[in-house]
Amino acid sequence: MLFLVVFLHLYRFTFGPQHPAAHGVLCCLLYFCGEFIVYIDCIIGYLHRGTEKLCEYKSVEQCLPYFDRLDYVSVCCNEHLLSLCFEYMLRCCLSLRCAFMRLLIVEFTRSFNGLLCISCMVLDLGCLSPLLWSFEERDKLMTFFDLCCGCRMHLAFMVLLGILDDFVFGFVDFLLLLIISCLFVMDCYDLLFVGNRLFYLRLRGLSFFDLYDLVFNSLSGVLSRSLGMVWDCRLFSCYELYFMFCYDYCFCFIGDAFDRLFLRLFDMRMSLLICKQCFFVGFFVFGFVCLFDYLYCDITIETIIMLFYSLWCCCLPGISFACVEHPKGEYCLLLCFCVGLCSRLRLRCADFLHICLLDVCLRGFLLHDLVAVLGNIDVVFGSVDR
């Protein structure tokens, strides 16, 4: 009997954390057989700030700034998760006007995140012009955030039991022009990316996931819908007012990088259509924008000191859970509340689970495919290294 024994010599390379495509905070140990990747060992934690620990034994409004810094591309979606979880515990309902305004800013944030994800992925593939083009629309969206709350990055727009302030009267014209402009840009993006033969040949067949990864590794968001999973928290969990809107739902079956690019473009378009419906309905609904309005407080130094030191919104000890459809996937929050303070807080961030599967989806591919896939799965390390 003849036995054939083949000895493979593996080469080990270190990718990152200094590499720009690794965001400066990701280290990958790559094992190669020739030019092909055999195994990837991801080393994370270079940006670790202990967010969950820092939020312990603080009031919920003191935890909001930490959530701003989790996924610093989708700030309002992070704030929305914490506010929603606390409101579930209080079992309170917001006014229709406040709910519409929340959805408007959340869906604009989803488009804001998608623009950066797609443009940076295309930059990793070697194209510079789409990055500069997308930043024009991102600057318009930042101007929208600035008009809403006076900030461009760390917004602090969603306060507990409401939003920061009502929109100003002259804001309506700018908002309508912004929605029309973004919808026009989405048409151009479809022609540039989906209808482009070069992008199709480069991304089709790159980094497959399968149904085993979907079930046992908890894929969510765009990655799960690219495998044919008909699931979207906005559509099936019915949180906030998403059941009142008319929008389409899309999923693919191959599960490669091109499907994920197509679904991100589709999600951005649907977010803008939801914003359009919010604009035509929400601005004609009257109501309070916050159940506890600071504007009607007596503006004296004693009142300011009282608001600063007091726990203004307390509830009975308990546990609350909330899950939202974040631009990265499903974000879940478990909040334990006791004596007016947040005693325990646990986050389930989708991009942390997605980056753990780099080894699965890149075996047999080349080094330059790793850079393309890192941009394609949309990872922000503020939430990965929380």
Curated annotation (Swiss-Prot):
Function: Core subunit of the mitochondrial membrane respiratory chain NADH dehydrogenase (Complex I) that is believed to belong to the minimal assembly required for catalysis. Complex I functions in the transfer of electrons from NADH to the respiratory chain. The immediate electron acceptor for the enzyme is believed to be ubiquinone. Component of the iron-sulfur (IP) fragment of the enzyme. Component of the iron-sulfur (IP) fragment of the enzyme.
Enzyme kind, highest EC tier: translocase
PROSITE patterns the record matches: COMPLEX1_49K
Subcellular location field: Mitochondrion
Cellular component terms (Gene Ontology): mitochondrion
Name under which the protein is recorded: NADH-ubiquinone oxidoreductase 49 kDa subunit homolog
Family of the protein in this entry: Belongs to the complex I 49 kDa subunit family.
GO biological process, alphabetically ordered: mitochondrial electron transport, NADH to ubiquinone
A Pfam family of this chain: Complex1_49kDa
Catalytic activity, reaction form: a ubiquinone + NADH + 5 H(+)(in) = a ubiquinol + NAD(+) + 4 H(+)(out)
Principal place of residence: mitochondrion
Protein keywords: Electron transport, Mitochondrion, NAD, Oxidoreductase, Respiratory chain, Translocase, Transport, Ubiquinone
EC number annotated for this UniProt entry: 7.1.1.2
Domain of life according to the entry: Eukaryota
Keyword presence, Translocase: yes
InterPro entries assigned to the protein according to its UniProt record, in alphabetical order: NADH_Q_OxRdtase_suD, NADH_UbQ_OxRdtase_49kDa_CS, NDH1_su_D/H, NiFe-Hase_large
One function term, GO molecular function aspect: quinone binding
Signal peptide coordinates: none
